[in-house]
């Protein structure tokens, strides 16, 4: 019986089974190598990704995160500065818009004040010129406005004294020109005698 089993020919089915069993054993090493390569490549890719990712993460970590309080403060500061700049720009535009009107108003007020001052000075000078024509003056007189007013007051006082005296003749009263000339001469003499200097000192 042993000889029969050993000498019995192997059927094709047995060969195919044995071959099929050997083929997976032969194919396993390449698959293992491929798996190893895939694992190595995946590790390399993971390591490379981790490297740039780490760098990127470090860059992000070095800066402020979007939700960090430092960046929030900076954001608020930048927003505040931007708002202030906008407000400053708005104020400049409003002031620039209102400045020409205020400048024109100031100019018109100054012009009107200058016109009023010129009119007042002109009328005052005309009044003093008329007063100097009435008051008897000496050729050497260079009277200021205050001196002219004082001389006019003294001349009025002199005229009052002349009217109170009996020296005024009726003929002199009838001729106004002669009366004015004599009064002017008398007033000039009165001034030169020192009455004016004494009154001016007071």
UniProtKB/Swiss-Prot annotation:
Name this protein carries in UniProt: Twist-related protein 1
Compartment list: Nucleus
Any one Gene Ontology molecular-function term assigned to this protein's record: histone deacetylase binding
Tissue expression profile of the protein: Subset of mesodermal cells.
SUPFAM superfamilies linked: HLH, helix-loop-helix DNA-binding domain
Residue intervals of the bHLH domain: 108-159
Residue numbers spanned by region Sufficient for transactivation activity: 161-191
